[in-house]
């Protein structure tokens, strides 16, 4: 074909059977103006052969089909016939668009989109472009129409102001549908029907409007496309129309970021025809109205103006707020006592602003009210601080009656103490006048008036006190509390404790925190509150008194309002009563009055959010934060706060802003000036989790706790981030408060100032909770002198050393409780810890002294037996308690892993914080990402792990790849244990450590500096090394274990344990020599026994002997340790075995013949390393093998011998042996090592003769596991190895496997490849049956697809059942072919395949096809088409720059061009599925013409048998 540059321009009309009438009209019109040379009528087949873009214009109708898709992919210029007709009629050029244009319905239209989801926006763009329009992402002057999904965006407001049409996406779809029917313009469709409604996407709620206005708003909202809701809903409501800036809806709307706008916004939007900008109609909270006029009368600097705004209780809407004289006000209110009949129904509760303690001491029962009236009365009682009862009891003081009730009359006739029975006017008038009104003038006429009996006299006195002074209604405390108020002025700030709120002490929980202990009648009255039959209703802060200090007027009014809604009481700063809480700003202020706790507004906000009373010491933000004024240490930091919400988050953002930091919501790595985003430098969060935390780790940005911010505020300097990383916070310290630190620089402005300031009493901050023993509370000279002599530190050091360990409050009484004038004060102190501190400290020589008593000797003997019979945790018992104590004093734990740099694998990301913390505590460093400085990589996985992370680390030399248990062992044993004992395959449930004693000696000798300790260790080491070679008799063991020293039972323990180690080492030595005899390497000079007899007994010598031994022996320690009987005499280890040189040579030949060149198992790899390291030069990281390797090793060395030379083995087991020439034996004699309950199953050679044929017995069973839980994998892997099988640990299918055990049939690579290769696909019950039989059994009954399995497993779907049946069908078919024809075939034998799929999936497809006997070509060039039989391609998953096969050319040459789904369906279905259903689109024309390509090609091939053809068709 000619080059596209030289090809002439022409117009090609693509002819097909589905052309419309416009196609012919366009062609006829073009013939009139174009020559025959430049106008062509072509077929689709000609377009499919086109390989590159040319200069021609292609006229297609419709825009579908293979030819259209091919041309579009090449980027050719494609238009529809309507475009040709329109351009000719209007004398316009055909558009040169980069995309196909079907018609010109939207010519001259430029659109932009806003508030659309991604899918809808892409559809709009597609339709506009295909109709000849233009699309802009941004809104500019050229845009003619805006397509909007809803109103309110910036694009919407600008377009509306520019009077551009704002339309819905349905307008574009309507144009497309009509343009397919006839040639139209966009103006032919009425746009008014598709204009975006004014309130589209708005969910409107109202508050404060009349019912008529509400209905009108509801009607107009629905008319203009909005949604009206009566309830304000979070994440649903978008606008709240408010009359005034108050009310519950308004507060919630502000919190939920809902637009709070006036009703004018609503009507202006309708009038102007588009939704107005909400910022122009925003309703802000009104400032507090001053109700007291400015006068010349001095009122005192600290006195607050009376904040009560006086309202009438009638329905008059315009209430005068002008201030009048108070006495005149009282008389004016008295003249309007009688409200209208429906006053209570229409009463606005918010207009009654009375003192919060107005009803203090009143216990009220409401009778005869319901509906809205009852709700309003409840709110009034709660706001006034009263206690409301739900049922009549003897504790009720006031009964407010609406309608008469017979039960009330009966109660009044029976009760001895009759309460006041009043009308509702008493309550309304009391609120209107600001103080309680006398009850006598409000008695209900239906009930007889009686006097209150004596138990209620305190309440009468309280009422009288309130009536006596109307100018100060808040000053109404009882007279007998004056002494306690006076005393409380001299107590230390913050020393008053919060009382226990447990029901048992509810008699002390009075409405204020001060109780009158001597007033028995009041206590009797209050005790009734604890009656379980009485239900008391109150808010969150019920019975709590507050003092608000240090806020602006607006903030203070807001806080007071919150208190009212939660039934709290706010005291004035001049009131002498002790408030429960003083609420101050976050940075604190001066608190002159005595209060129970000083808390911040953050505490208040979080209590409201969580709807419970929080402990002020549970969070550092709940108490004032020390702050160095004028310091901005974080001015160059950009902070992101995550995982904090509500008031806690606001407080942290506020504090960070004060420190100079920039706080932004999004956590980005690079700055984006257009969006106003800065590159983050710090992340502040609670826990080490979440997407932002992962990003911080990935970008190496510090993720710190909020304590870092507090430290920066405290010191005025930027604190070190490493000390406050969220990963370093222990679990038990995550909830600890940070407020109990006593270090306060003098330059810091303290947040609280008491009469005794903190600079003179640094322990004041630690007394929020009284601990059982606080050294600072012992003020006597005698105690202080003793303590100072003992500590040799200043007095405050003891208090400062324990401030971080905050102890729970004991809820003790304050001096105002127990310092009564008529009672004798008898203090009691808990001084047990103080007396213990006065004991004489132990001297340096006392650490090894023990007392010998008969009981201790009995314990010592029992301890020896327990240790000798234990096979676990030997490292924990080999070191005596004295040695452990000495190590703790001598060694510094922070230097155990010095010069070690760890990096934790991504697989252990959940444990990363914990592991990094352990490493840091042991002196190691850690890295978030693997780099050049890492020395230890913490990983957990299989031996031949296929993960990229493991491979990349393994390629690096000198890196220890260890298990997480290595760190745990170092921390537990307080020493650096060898890395070889904890490879990344280490499993504590399957690994038993017996070499910890040697390593303990090595570590102790390396680090110990104590002379006596060194001698002790050297003697122990000498004993252990002698025991290695079985040269120590019983007498020597007893002598070495400390004979004649009954006062040191630890030496006896060592002696008993040494016997155990002696037997184990002898057995290991025998196995080592057995393996050495079967190794094809030169003998090592350092392994002989003669070389050890005179060697120095040093730790280095012990280690070198280990390095010189076989690595297989080091691995066998795990599976052989449990076989040792620790009660056996040492002499029984001296075995006499006949040495057969011929047998040893034959075994050596057998080992060399059993090397599997095709096996991917761990054994061949590890054995090769072992041969390369024959000289003993290998690192400790390679000292250990996994259990799978051990099983493969034994399968290599033991199984053939058990089958071929069974009589020889039996003879060896029964014949005497000589100790100098040990013949390798597969297992030690049962006399020396009886297997009582071994954790590891016996080897297959010990089993009776299997009921298999000789061929089946010699056949090796190689298993792969799939779709099993991790614990099942571990369990079944161990079982297979115990039974003599081999487990292949690969993520993908291994052709060398013979069986695959599957949890559930899945359509994955392992299952399909096993099916294609005819392997045994078994249910897990097969392994359980083998476990019960202790051998491998026949497989037929446990195969997936067998009736026994399918009938037992009922929870499988049809696809899984089809997979199960297909596995058995292919296994029988392929095994039958092998038996009948002697040919090993697969399901795909004879296939020659070309693959063109995603590169990440191509290896899996290749392995699957090859497992079934197919030949897969590398690449997909054209010459391969002649030889190939199948082509599988998936272009949808290919990247644009990846090469693609020419499907049309391949199909033309008879290659079956199919989708990859055909492979799995071919295996699963009983009959091969029709290829036409899986044919690629570009190959369909050739399938119709030539038929099935495979049939034609295979008929001409002579190398394919009829049997293969019959399987394919």
Curated annotation (Swiss-Prot):
A motif (Nuclear localization signal) lies at residues 844-850, 1508-1511. The modification Phosphoserine is found at residue 1131. Keywords: Cell cycle, Chromosome, Cytoplasm, Cytoskeleton, DNA damage, DNA repair, DNA replication, DNA-binding, Nucleus, Phosphoprotein, Repeat. Its main location: nucleus. Residues 786-799 have a biased composition (Polar residues). Residues 101-189, 194-283, 354-444, 538-611, 629-726, 892-984, 1253-1344, 1383-1480 form the BRCT domain. It is found in: Nucleus; Chromosome; Cytoplasm, Cytoskeleton, Microtubule organizing center, Centrosome; Cytoplasm, Cytoskeleton, Spindle pole. It holds the Pfam family TopBP1_BRCT0. GO terms for biological process: chromosome organization; DNA amplification; DNA damage response; DNA replication checkpoint signaling; DNA replication initiation; double-strand break repair via alternative nonhomologous end joining; double-strand break repair via homologous recombination; mitotic DNA replication checkpoint signaling. Phosphorylation at Ser-1131 is essential for phosphorylation of chek1, and thus for checkpoint regulation. InterPro entries: BRCT_dom, BRCT_dom_sf, BRCT_TopBP1_rpt8, Secretoglobin_sf, TopBP1-like_BRCT0, TopBP1_BRCT_1. PROSITE patterns: BRCT. GO terms for molecular function: chromatin binding; chromatin-protein adaptor activity; DNA binding; phosphorylation-dependent protein binding; protein serine/threonine kinase activator activity. GO terms for cellular component: centrosome; chromosome; cytoplasm; nucleus; site of double-strand break; spindle pole. Residues 289-308, 786-809, 1031-1053, 1086-1109 are annotated as: Disordered. Interacts with cdc45. Interacts (via BRCT domains) with ticrr; interaction is cdk2-dependent. Interacts with atr in the presence of atrip. Interacts with recql4 (via N-terminus). Interacts with gmnc. Interacts with cip2a; forming the CIP2A-TOPBP1 complex. Belongs to the TOPBP1 family. Some BRCT domains specifically recognize and bind phosphoserine/phosphothreonine marks on proteins. The N-terminal half is sufficient for DNA replication. Scaffold protein that acts as a key protein-protein adapter in DNA replication and DNA repair. Composed of multiple BRCT domains, which specifically recognize and bind phosphorylated proteins, bringing proteins together into functional combinations. Required for DNA replication initiation but not for the formation of pre-replicative complexes or the elongation stages. Necessary for the loading of replication factors onto chromatin, including gmnc, cdc45, DNA polymerases and components of the GINS complex such as ginsl/sld5. This is DNA topoisomerase 2-binding protein 1-B. It comes from Xenopus laevis (African clawed frog).
